Amino acid sequence: MIGPVIKILEAPEEMPAVEALQRAVWPDSETDVVPAHVFIAAIHNGGLLLGAFVDDQLIGFVFGFPGLETTPDGPRAKHCSHMMGILPGYRNSGVGFALKRAQWQMVRHQGLDHITWTYDPLLSRNAYLNITKLGAVCNTYRRSEYGEMRDGLNAGLPSDRFLVDWWINTRRVERRLGKRARRPLKLHNFSQANLQPLYAPQAPAGSWPRPPEHFSPLEGRLALAEIPSDINALKEADFALARDWRFFSREIFETAFASGYLITDFVYDEGRSFYVLSHGESTLEQ
């Protein structure tokens, strides 16, 4: 597919299409649809709404607004990227990357250097985009961030989320978004370095992998943490097992972040998904 055309959306007559797109992306969630007047209010106060178009059809959008974060030196301005939605038929085709790259350009023009957003840690596709492709990092785990969610993609599981940091002026991010983007890491890159995963999911023949009862102590500079490769398919096949993965992964990441680790990469290879945990901040510029 030829890359989508990315446009800034700011006129009232453009908002109904964004409302309709939300209903297509998040079915059964009418009460969660962001209405036109909220988009307009945000846009008039520094917010940013970008749309992706193919043949003049809106197929995706990303929406964010200015925010403040608490630092030891006082409040600091950032951009809060709140929503991104893409029609199912256009996922895994580079639309999300194109939207985030355009957002990166626009927010830099606003004079900001930090974008944050949340996503479900168990969504491999989102992790691959956010961490591998965009170069965001994470050391914040939020339990039940949005309370009970009712839409078709999120219903049933606790709404635990990663809060990721995208330091948009760093060499790390500029390299990921450049024309010569770094090749994604593969499992053999870690096996060559004699780095083994923290745990091996139990995988009975013909069934979904199950989280182990225990995991190895976090030691050294790097660690690998495996998650299910397709949590949505797992939810449909065995919802109780999907919940087990939610609580197991919660323990893994809360333990890692409390011990000074942060997520700096993500590996999808051979049908398996792994987060790369780094101790300290030595990899932020890479």
Where are these regions (language model features)?
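Intrinsically disordered, low-complexity, positively biased terminal segments
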Residues: 11, 110, 123, 129-132, ...
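Conserved acetyl-CoA-binding loop-helix of GNAT-fold acetyltransferases
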Residues: 86, 92-107, 126, 241, ...
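A conserved beta-strand-loop-helix scaffold within acyl/acetyltransferase catalytic domains
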Residues: 4-88, 120, 142, 264-269, ...
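Conserved GNAT acetyl-CoA-binding A-motif
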Residues: 107-120
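Short, glycine/acidic-rich beta->alpha junctions
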Residues: 44, 98-99, 116, 122-123
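Broad gene-expression machinery/nucleic-acid interaction feature
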Residues: 78, 114, 161-163
